């Protein structure tokens, strides 16, 4: 079982040497040459510096296509027409599974076709120099966004290629994404990624790391998401990471989302060591979207309003075409502009929402209880503790496909649309907190004239895509049972 100890320089070099032959572009990686390339970049392309010095939330979309020139064109469009402050490069699914041969076939097919045969940018196949061409061609900093349980070679190639931010982590890119990777193995893989980022940082090239906050993206209780962020942050900090962006995915209730983002920042600064700079990122709604673009814009606007009130350091935007899959560049840019409009109109207003302090206090209590259980499960070692906590169910993620998590915890919304826990299973929360959740869900059940049941859970999963927040019986979102004018 891995422990939360820093990899030695010899261990880092040995693993890197073993990885070089996994695909031929791995042999292009030269650390000293990479340092020199990063040092040649202007301040405007240094991700951590741009993010950490901003005085309002920065916007970043998701975007990735197979071919280099098309990826450059896409990101330039989002930069120039969408006003993106930070840019992404989303990696394809074959690369996420380390299937570089299949990625190569898809890249070759895409080059000879008007169709994209991959759902992202195969950075390992492109290699170091193509990555540098991408970085040189753009004005804004660029982040690697992927979903890869074993991202070691991807990190080697992209960091050498000039990327200065790398998303993911051993829990957030395992539990929500895959069945076939055990948590101990992904922790070991990500210790290498984080140590590599730390090695760059120690040479004056700060690599920003961003754990994936939304997890499964489906009604994740805030305290569970924040606990995972803190664990991944601690693991990264041990390996020398000094710029950490902790993530959170919108659940849809404005008060709860603002409270959660404030709790995330506060607890991040509390649990992570002093030399770490903590920033936060807010992901606009990651669940199902309405098929109608006008309604989808309403969902995006709620995300923008939430960001204006909570003021995270970064917002990952969505488009009105989420329902149909990968959006057009025009729709992606429009999502950026919609979010920016909401933020710019609201950010200077003094908006006082009742209930935020109480909700934040509850989230913090829950998160501390989960963190205490993790430390106890590992006798103070966070790596061992999180493995044991997931194994026992003391920590869990709803709707997770991974065999490393029990997936027994179930959420549902209360009468205000805040995400509560309907089924706790073995989650390590005290009885008085469980009673609060049960009481809030009981109020909703009374309003709706039905018993608390799994039907509530299922109704809530589909509610926003159906044009509501709460999955009321019969599709009626009015607590009083009146007719809805939404259809």
Curated annotation (Swiss-Prot):
This chain belongs to which protein, by name? Answer: Glutamate mutase epsilon subunit
Q: Note the SUPFAM superfamilies from the entry.
A: Cobalamin (vitamin B12)-dependent enzymes (SSF51703)
Oligomeric form and interacting partners? Heterotetramer composed of 2 epsilon subunits (GlmE) and 2 sigma subunits (GlmS). GlmE exists as a homodimer and GlmS as a monomer.
Tell me one GO molecular function of this protein: cobalamin binding
Q: What does this protein do?
A: Catalyzes the carbon skeleton rearrangement of L-glutamate to L-threo-3-methylaspartate ((2S,3S)-3-methylaspartate).
Give the binding site residues for adenosylcob(III)alamin: 64, 119, 176, 289, 318, 322
Q: Does the keyword Isomerase apply?
A: yes
Protein family per UniProt:
Belongs to the methylaspartate mutase GlmE subunit family.
- Keywords, sorted A to Z: Cobalamin, Cobalt, Isomerase
Q: Does the keyword Isomerase apply?
A: yes
In the record, biological process GO terms are: anaerobic glutamate catabolic process; glutamate catabolic process via L-citramalate
Swiss-Prot/TrEMBL cofactor(s): adenosylcob(III)alamin
Pathway where this protein functions: Amino-acid degradation; L-glutamate degradation via mesaconate pathway; acetate and pyruvate from L-glutamate: step 1/4
What InterPro entries does the record tag this protein with? Cbl-dep_enz_cat, Glu_mut_E, Glu_mut_E_C_dom_sf
Q: Which of this chain's residues are annotated to bind L-glutamate? A: 62, 96, 145-146, 167, 173, 177
Reaction catalysed by this enzyme? (2S,3S)-3-methyl-L-aspartate = L-glutamate
Chain spans, region Disordered: 465-487
> Which EC number applies?
5.4.99.1
């Amino acid at each position: 079982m891995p422990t939360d100890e820093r990899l030695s320089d010899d261990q880092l070099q040995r693993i890197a040497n073993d990885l070089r032959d996994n695909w031929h572009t791995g042999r292009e990686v030269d650390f000293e040459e990479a340092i020199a390339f990063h040092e040649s970049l202007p301040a405007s392309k240094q991700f951590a510096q741009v993010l950490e010095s901003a005085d309002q939330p920065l916007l970043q979309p998701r975007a990735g296509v197979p071919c280099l020139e098309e990826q450059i064109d896409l990101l330039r469009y989002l930069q120039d027409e969408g006003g993106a402050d930070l840019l992404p490069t989303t990696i394809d699914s074959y690369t996420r599974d380390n299937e570089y041969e299949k990625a190569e076939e898809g890249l070759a097919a895409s080059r000879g076709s008007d169709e994209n045969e991959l759902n992202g940018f195969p950075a390992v196949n492109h290699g170091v120099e193509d990555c540098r061409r991408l970085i040189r061609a753009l004005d804004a900093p660029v982040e690697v966004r992927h979903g890869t349980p074993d991202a070691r070679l991807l990190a080697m190639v992209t960091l050498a290629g000039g990327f200065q931010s790398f998303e993911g982590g051993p829990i957030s890119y395992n539990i929500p994404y895959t069945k076939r990777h055990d948590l101990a193995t992904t922790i070991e893989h990500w210790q290498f990624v984080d140590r590599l980022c730390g090695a760059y940082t120690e040479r004056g090239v700060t690599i920003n790391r961003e754990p994936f906050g939304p997890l499964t993206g489906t009604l994740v209780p805030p305290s569970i998401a924040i606990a995972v962020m803190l664990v991944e942050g601690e693991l990264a900090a041990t390996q020398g990471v000094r710029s950490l962006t902790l993530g959170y995915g919108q659940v849809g209730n404005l008060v709860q989302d603002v409270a959660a983002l404030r709790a995330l920042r506060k607890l991040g600064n509390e649990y992570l060591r002093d030399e770490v700079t903590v920033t936060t990122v807010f992901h606009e709604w990651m669940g199902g979207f309405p098929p109608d673009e006008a309604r989808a814009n309403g969902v995006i606007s709620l995300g923008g309003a939430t960001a204006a009130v909570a003021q995270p350091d970064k917002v990952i935007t969505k488009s009105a075409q989420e329902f149909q899959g990968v959006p057009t560049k025009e729709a992606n840019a429009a999502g950026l502009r919609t979010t920016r409009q909401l933020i710019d109109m609201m950010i200077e207003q003094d908006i006082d929402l009742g209930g935020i302090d109480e909700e934040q206090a509850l989230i913090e209590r829950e998160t501390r209880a989960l963190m205490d259980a993790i430390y106890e499960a590992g006798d103070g070692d966070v790596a061992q503790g999180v493995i044991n906590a997931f194994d026992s169910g003391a920590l869990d993620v709803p709707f997770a496909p991974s065999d490393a998590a029990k997936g027994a915890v179930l959420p549902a919304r209360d009468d205000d649309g805040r995400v509560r826990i309907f089924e706790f299973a073995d989650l390590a929360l005290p009885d008085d907190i469980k009673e609060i959740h049960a009481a809030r869900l009981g109020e909703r059940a009374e309003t709706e004239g039905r018993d608390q049941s799994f039907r509530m859970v299922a109704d809530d999963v589909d509610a926003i895509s159906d044009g509501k927040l709460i999955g009321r019986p019969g599709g009626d979102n009015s607590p009083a049972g009146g007719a809805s004018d939404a259809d």
